[in-house]
Amino acid sequence: MPPRFDVLIPFLEHLGLRLLEIGGGRARVGFDPKPEHLNSWKAIHGGGVMTVLDAALSSACRSLDEGCIGATTVELKVNFIAAARGPVIAEGRAQRAGRSLLFAEGELRDGAGAVLAKATGTFKLVYPQARGE
C-alpha cells in the first residue's frame, strides 16, 4: 500500500493526489488529471501544477520532523517549462532547515521523465497545540 499524507487534506483528496513516497527530506506525489483539471489547451491548469508541486515540497519538509502535523507554505515559486499533459509526478526535496523555516525545491515530470515545471518554496512546520504553537 502506498504511503498516505497522514493528515486529512480535503483539497488534495478532491484532486486525487497520491503520495507515492515520503521520507528523509524527500517526497513524490502523483496526479492523474481529469478533464476538469485542464485549461483550454488540454493541459493541466497552472494552479493544478502548482498544487502538485506544493504538496510534494511541503511533504518533503514535513518528513524531517515526525512531531509536526503539517507544513504551511510561506512562499512558492514555479517556473513553467512545458505543458503538463497526462499523468505527472512531482518530486520535492528539503534543502535547508533554518530555526523556524525550511527551504525546498522540486520538479514536475511527465511519464517519460521530461521536466515540465520547477519549483522552490519556503515552509513552516506546524505542531499540535500541546507543543505551544
Feature-to-residue mapping (PLM):
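Terminal targeting signals and extreme-terminal segments of soluble enzymes
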Residues: 1-133
